[in-house]
Swiss-Prot record:
Encoding gene (name): SIP1
Region feature (Kinase-interacting sequence (KIS)): 473-716
Protein name as annotated: SNF1 protein kinase subunit beta-1
Cell compartments where the protein resides: Cytoplasm; Vacuole membrane
Positions of the UniProt region annotated as Disordered: 1-88, 120-146, 311-335, 363-389, 410-444, 581-616
PANTHER family for the chain: 5'-AMP-ACTIVATED PROTEIN KINASE , BETA SUBUNIT, SNF1 PROTEIN KINASE SUBUNIT BETA-1
Compositional bias (Low complexity): 313-326, 377-389, 433-444, 599-608
A GO BP entry: signal transduction
Post-translational modification: Phosphorylated by SNF1 in vitro.
Sites of N-myristoyl glycine lipidation: G2
Length: 815
């Protein structure tokens, strides 16, 4: 679209823009167009930018200044152009003046009764606004919908938008009482963005330049006030003061909240901003942060806080309590209530103190539980020493319950001399002859009632010199002693310090008895495995019960049973001296009697007041028992000892009764019993087996050769004679050992020419074939059933034959 030439002010005629001759050539080509005649000042738009920087006036916009300084009868060179000048007379096609201000003045009804005006023309002189402000004609086919109401001029519309904030402040009403916090924030953002926006001098569209400055000329936005749910927003976005019937009371409470906002909302956290637009996720995140921060409350202030909150609940107003606390002054202002963020918000929203009281009660109960747990752990712990008891005594006044902490001594059954050994166990402590009643003596007396003194000796080789290093290597004993040392804190133990980490316990040589032993070895109930180390060589003792560990090595073991003060494990002398079974004429070894030693001090001897040696029997060898199972048998052992069973009585083994009579099952003949006397060995030597004597021991080939008399009798007759004399047993007679051995030998000899491993018959039957019933197919109307068992390393196969008339029965059924 072309532009019509225009004249320029003579003051600007000397100023030529760069490339003006190109614009002149372009304007000459477009001078005959319709748009150049409609918008005769379009060509001069590029002159406006230059004039804006040099001749800027705050009252008149730059474009208006440029239009006022131009004359439409002059071109860009300052010369009059006769061929491009528009006739100023009346025209039949176009209006003489296309300015919108004149149309608005005469109420022209064209363009759907709409009045358009440039925002820069507001307040300008009348001679400057007569030129049209269109830069483009817009769409060729414009569609305009007629409306009943007319749109006023933008200048009139801008002046009608009154700042409601200023009016509310004049009336004494704060502006935040009229709108919600989200609307306030939106309004504030719009005002800030409009205040920072400035008109750009490089804008080329008058439509955009007309729409944006409307915000710059207004100081506020009028937004309709909505107050749903009949509640007033307080100074915070999440707090609301519900309306009361008494307006004076509600206004006073609102003023009171605003005055005490600093004291009440000291812990408001991230929810304290009044211009924050809240949603569900933002509220949850804020609550989490407040709860994490409020959870770190000092527990020492809980008692005072509970009293302060209970006083506040009686008054029924948290704000009044806060003011009273501020007036009281002193150190009470430093304490804060340990309430959660949720309870605090509910209190601010609804004035409800139920959740806050519940939080306080929960915190108080948690503190009480923690204190009671500390008391129980201090009273029941076996690791507490005398020094720790003194510290608990000093702390007793601080505890709220005021319990007197005293050490508890467990009761253990003790064998009494004057009473029967089958009576119920009683508590009895051992008297120790010591001059000082120190803490260590009390601990050792308590420890002696719990544990048992074990006497371990090395008796195998009495020639071991005193200079030899003899140790006991036992992980079980070392762990038990380490646990005792941690419990009793005994630093003056007679054992090595290495046994805390090394399972080696040094043995002491006794010059009087010429033996090695372990002094003062107190162990709890259980099973212990050990080995002896003599000059670095591990071995086991034959005087102690033996067993094998998981690697197959021989180890010694012994068991400590509850209810005894002293035990000395050893094996029976009968097992050590000889492993031969006693004959009937010899007297069986008796169980060793109980040895009792006089009461003495623990430090003077390793025997205690009720020393009892509990020997082990060959029937009680180690078979995979564990310490836990032995400890669990404590109650059962005590009940068994109190019963009527005599555990210490002599064991009477059963005497075996022998007989010389042969059962009828093994008799061969007419059933007459044959008695064999023990004193008839010198009568005469036994006859060899024959047809008439000991036929079971005869060889089958020799027996039938004798019956046939050198071939005079055939085999069938000899078999009939044999069957007439001896009845047919369960198994055929040809299934004797010699017959089977001959078959096996022949099969092995035949397989020597081939591969021996594949053809040889394995005499060892797989265990999967043992104790299984095997059968064969029916042949010659006979079925056989067999079963193989193993007895003392040998295999015995029993075969049972039975007639099976299968074909005969089938033929009878078919007939």
């Amino acid at each position: 679209m072309g532009n019509s030439p225009s004249t320029q002010d003579p003051s600007h005629s000397t100023k030529k823009e760069h490339g003006h001759h190109f614009h002149d050539a372009f304007n000459k080509d477009r001078q005959g167009s319709i748009t150049s005649q409609l918008f005769n000042n379009r060509k001069s738009t590029h002159k406006r930018r230059a004039s804006h920087t040099s001749e800027h006036n705050g009252a008149i916009p730059p474009r208006m200044q440029l239009l006022a300084s131009h004359d439409p009868s002059t071109d860009c060179d300052g010369r009059m152009s006769s061929d491009t000048t528009i006739d100023k007379g009346p025209s039949h096609l176009f209006k003489k003046d296309y300015s919108l201000s004149s149309a608005a003045d005469v109420n022209d009804t064209t363009l759907a009764n709409l009045t358009l005006s440039d925002d820069h023309d507001v307040g300008a002189p009348e001679e400057q606004v007569k030129s049209p402000s269109f830069l483009s004609p817009g769409p060729s086919m414009a569609t305009v919908k007629r409306t009943k109401s007319d749109l006023d001029d933008l200048s009139t519309l801008n002046y009608t938008m009154v700042d409601e904030t200023t009016e509310n402040e004049r009336n004494g009403k704060p502006h935040h009482e009229r709108h919600r916090s989200s609307i306030i924030a939106l309004k504030k953002n719009l005002l800030e963005s409009s205040a920072t926006a400035s008109p750009s001098p490089t804008r080329s569209s008058s439509v955009h330049s007309a729409s944006l400055p409307a915000l710059t000329k207004t100081d506020s936005i009028d937004i309709p006030v909505r107050q749903p749910y009949s509640k007033k927003p307080s100074i915070h976005a999440y707090q609301y003061q519900y309306l009361n019937n008494d307006e004076t009371f509600s206004e006073n409470s609102q003023m009171d909240k605003e005055g005490n906002s600093d004291s009440v909302d000291a812990e408001a956290g991230v929810l304290q901003s009044e211009d924050m637009v809240l949603n569900q996720s933002l509220l949850q995140n804020a609550l989490k942060k407040d709860m994490q921060r409020l959870s770190r409350v000092n527990s020492s202030n809980s008692m005072y806080t509970a009293e302060r909150i209970s006083h506040a609940n009686n008054n029924g107003n948290i704000e009044n309590n806060t003011r009273n606390k501020g007036n009281a002054g002193g150190s009470n202002d430093d304490f804060t209530a340990p309430i959660s963020a949720t309870a605090k918000m509910m209190m601010k929203l609804y004035g409800d103190k139920t959740l806050m009281e519940r939080d306080l009660n929960k915190h108080h109960n948690k503190t009480k539980k923690a204190q009671s747990k500390k008391i129980r752990s201090a009273s029941n712990s076996r690791r507490s020493s005398f020094a720790s008891l003194h510290s608990l005594q000093s702390r007793k006044s601080i505890l709220t319950n005021g319990l007197n902490l005293q050490p508890l001594h467990p009761l253990h059954p003790i064998i009494n001399d004057n009473e029967s050994q089958y009576s119920a166990p009683q508590h009895r402590e051992i008297s120790h002859h010591s001059n000082s009643m120190s803490s260590m003596s009390s601990i050792s007396s308590t420890n002696s009632t719990e544990n048992t003194l074990v006497v371990l000796k090395w008796k195998d080789d009495g020639t071991v010199a005193a200079t030899t290093e003899v140790f006991i290597v036992s992980t079980d004993i070392a762990s038990a002693l380490k646990e005792q040392r941690e419990l009793t804190l005994d630093e003056n133990a007679s054992l090595d310090s290495e046994k805390q980490l090394n399972p080696r316990i040094r043995m002491v040589y006794d010059d009087v008895h010429k033996e090695w032993f372990v002094p003062d070895l107190f162990l709890p109930a259980g099973i212990y495995r050990l080995q002896f180390s003599i000059n670095g060589i591990l071995t086991h003792s034959n005087f102690l019960p033996t067993a094998t560990d998981s690697e197959g090595n021989f180890v010694n073991w012994f068991e400590v049973l509850p209810g005894y003060h002293t035990i000395e494990p050893f094996r029976n002398e009968a097992d050590i001296d000889s492993q031969v079974e006693p004959t009937l004429d010899e007297e069986l070894p008796k169980r060793p009697e109980l040895k009792r030693f006089p009461s003495s001090s623990r430090k003077s001897s390793y025997y205690s007041a009720k020393g009892v040696e509990r020997p082990s029997t060959p029937f009680s060898d180690y078979r995979g028992l564990s310490r836990s199972s032995s400890i669990n048998m404590r109650d059962s052992f005590v009940r068994l000892k109190a019963s009527s069973l005599d555990l210490m009585a002599e064991v009477k083994p059963e005497r075996l009764v022998y007989s010389n009579e042969i059962p009828n099952l093994f008799n061969i003949g007419d059933g007459s019993t044959i008695s064999v006397k023990g004193d008839s060995d010198d009568v005469h030597p036994q006859e060899p087996p024959s047809f008439t004597h000991r036929v079971v021991d005869c060889n089958q080939d020799d027996l039938f050769a004798t019956l046939q008399q050198g071939g005079n009798i055939d085999a069938e007759t000899a078999e009939a004679v044999f069957l007439s004399r001896y009845p047919v047993p369960d198994l055929p007679i040809y299934l004797n050992s010699s017959y089977l051995n001959r078959i096996l030998n022949q099969s092995n000899q035949n397989s020597e020419s081939h591969e021996r491993d594949e053809g040889a018959i394995n005499h060892i039957i797989p265990h999967v074939n043992l104790n299984h019933l095997l059968t064969s197919s029916i042949r010659d109307e006979i079925i056989s059933v067999a079963c193989t068992t193993r007895y003392e390393g040998k295999f015995i196969t029993q075969v049972v034959y039975a007639p099976c008339y299968y074909k005969t029965q089938k033929s009878q059924i078919s007939n």
